[in-house]
């Protein structure tokens, strides 16, 4: 009998912080299951979830403003430990009888917190000692408002020069508030603090590991699917690849994968996918070469969004045709991951700002009447990668730089043609190969080549040629929300440019994109 890896669980209420998903990932890294819900959940929902502890996230709003978010009253009546982070601390203080005010001195960035009283959350955790012999913590602050009076049954545990209540605690009720962000790496002991809260104060067992997640997923899929057959669109990307191997472990040959080669993949990618999953792992794969069909559909289309929608529509058509040949299939598998679920929930409640147009199997016709299998829907991307390693997928494949769903369709600017894709594939392969050779690939967050539909004069030997231009793009980023262009060495860029121009007949000029995000986006389209 498998362990119930969901038995100990943390509930994180989201007040809108940019770090909230990071907070959830940190709890998962400790080995404990958690879920992320909007702040305005009902008492019944919390009771039904039955958390071992609750964390209130940070957020961009001010508790001093009318109508600002509040934690449900039941949070403080449930009898479980509660940790308030930044805004979460402020709403905890205000709701339990303290006071919060807007501060003239805002704190953004590094700060030193001096611990002046004992407390379970921080005992024995420190970065340094003060002149008075107190523990000092290096933390990351990001707040304008601050608590100016704590609830009467709380004690002050720590402060900074400008924040008198940096940590507050009610040990009897196991309520804690921290004005800083323990989830970010800039708070050096942050993970240690979260570990103390989750494992010791909440009493959770660390059951959430790659091996136990795989075991749990296999059991649940077998229960869900029974003796039926399943179809999966396999792209060779991380999510669909891990989904395929999990399903294969659960139901073996009753899984049929459909790999659609749209002609917009990287150099030799189709062959690599078939070798990896067909030959090495023994999956049942239908390989559909639909390059001509996709390129025909894209003919004459230059608008990026129109290209995306066309690629998505044709994929659905091709996949639907293949699925229709398999009437015995009763289930459709998808590589939906937890951030997709969070995004969809936010969209449904009207709390999301921008929802990307996805071009996956989610648009399949309703008449297919297939049940849905989503074995990754509880997992963050980093967890999916760890499970992939546990299942035997190569590190280099799982940790490749991001590749857009529409593939080269959005890296060829303007109209997409086979000639352009073939040139771009070869140029990009040279760039990536040289990054690996120079040990630079893992030092940048994303690197790729873009095809520009303009010709430039070049000189080869004694003659002139009028050929195409490509741009190299490499960025460094933590969250892909903002990014800096990577300062690659000049001699490296020169070597890449020289190889592309000499080895890829049809390209006469190579440029390097030095735009940051913002104002530019990482991808050109």
Swiss-Prot record:
Domain GMPS ATP-PPase residues, every copy: 208-400
Keywords assigned: ATP-binding, Glutamine amidotransferase, GMP biosynthesis, Ligase, Nucleotide-binding, Purine biosynthesis
Protein's pathway: Purine metabolism; GMP biosynthesis; GMP from XMP (L-Gln route): step 1/1
Catalysed reaction equations from the record: XMP + L-glutamine + ATP + H2O = GMP + L-glutamate + AMP + diphosphate + 2 H(+)
Keyword Ligase: yes
Amino-acid positions noted as binding ATP in the UniProt annotation, renumbered to this chain: 235-241
GO CC annotations, alphabetized: cytosol
Keyword Ion transport (UniProt): no
Domain Glutamine amidotransferase type-1: 9-207
EC number(s) given by UniProt: 6.3.5.2
Active site: 86 (nucleophile), 181, 183
Disulfide bond residue pairs: none
Self-association state and partner proteins as the record states: Homodimer.
Known role: Catalyzes the synthesis of GMP from XMP.
Protein name (Swiss-Prot/TrEMBL): GMP synthase [glutamine-hydrolyzing]
Source organism phylogeny: Bacteria, Pseudomonadati, Pseudomonadota, Gammaproteobacteria, Enterobacterales
